[in-house]
Amino acid sequence: MGNDPRLPSPSASPARADFWARDRAASGVPTPVFRGRPVVYVAPGELMATTLARAARTLLGSCVAVCLWDGNLRIGGMTHYLLPDSNGHPDVTPRYGDVAVAVLLERLHRLGARVERLEAKIFGGARVLPVFPGDGARVGDKNIALARDIVGRARIPIRGEDVGGDRGRKLIFCTDDGSAWVRRL
């Protein structure tokens, strides 16, 4: 997967793993449950990928969540990024969409997923922040465009999206069946 030209460069992937959403249920800590699945909260700048049945939950404003799912293996993951791309920023973390999606693809690959079996769902990107100086584009719009671009270049079909607008969203994505629930706030 590392040499697949359809995917973002793995060199953008950070070496640290402290951006992982903590799965409290895996450590035996009591946790909320959604439709029989332990809930894992994915905070801004975090991501998760798992072979376990989990309900990944997050809140989105201008941020975007890219959810990927492999239906054959019934595994999936979610990113929650704040800004579209790192643009050479020295702090290369999944707060940036280009890094977040590349790391999620890499982690899912390590769990056995294959890019040709993946399906994507994209959420968020509301217009709740001011425009970028100079180009007049809004953060949410740029986040949406980046998600569509990366997923499109990887030839991963987008099976659902709820993006844009002027309201935030509460999102729950089930990693074992690829289903998602969205509520606008």
Question: Where do the model's predicted regions map?
Answer:
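Active-site microenvironment for binding and transforming phosphate-containing groups
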Residues: M1-L185
